[in-house]
Amino acid sequence: MPVINFTYDELFKQLGCTLDKKELIDILPMISSDVESYDETEVKAEFFPNRPDYYSIEGIVRALKGYLDIEVGMPEYKVVEGDTTLTVDEELKDIRPYVASCIIKGVEIDDDELKNIMEFQEHLHWVIGRDRKKVAIGIHDYDTVEGPFYYKAGTPDEDKFIALDCNEEESLNQILETHDKGEKYAKLISDYDKYPLIVDSNDNIMSMPPIINSDLTKLTTNTKNLFIDVTGTDLTAVTNALNIIAANLSENADSIECVKVVYPYHDDVTYPQFEPKVLDVHVDTASEYIGMDLTADKIIQTLEKTRFNAQKVDDNTVRVTVPRYRIDILHEV
């Protein structure tokens, strides 16, 4: 299971209050965590693969706020319509056909958060992305590029860029041969005549998914706005990953700006897709499965503490609104 590392100081800062350290260690299992280890400064906690919304400290804090009655009910995010587009190349249909994107405005990134973002990205690569085969994620400094954006098929020996943490411009094939990420993930695209690229309106290459980002868009502690791209072979997985990233990384940001993905072979899609799922929970069914005598009011109170919205329909029915980052919730049971 993924192990999430965080410091007490980092967590308490985002939580907005300080807990006794032992109290925190006792609470974490109540939000589905297995505490692997801890010391005076840091905690290492495991979370199940069906809860990728916990794979960054923002997701953990969001759950703790509910458990501690600091904030209950479904979180609300400021999502603003924008005119940014990401246009998909027809040639990618049989290579890596799907992409999702959004822009997160007004982030504050210190060294701890920079580390958190990188670890969050890699955890999602493993759990949702199946080690990047199904989904790959790019997180960029938005202020280094200019829209509109393009998801295009690049020519391996002609297109060139400076890969992340490198100094020299190389062709796409050279990056596959010389960069450690290129060597590790080349098998995912090397059989194709062209490779996927994310580029901006000035033809700056931002990334070669699922391999490596460009050094041009590297995140730093001066980064204020994020451009997110998620590419993959499965549209549902791509959408789920983008929604989770958008929700978590905007917890401490000003807003999320929508990006419209324009396809030549699929309906256009605007992201993020935060329209919640709505389902009914029945008191008698819940009581039978849990083995307790429950009431609609008690179920509502519990659901709100776990960051759902819930309202009473009748004495046996509670209507539940499920946020889109909770991809583990499939049905009533």
Predicted regions and their residues:
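RNA/tRNA-interacting regions in translation and RNA-turnover enzymes
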Residues: 1-333
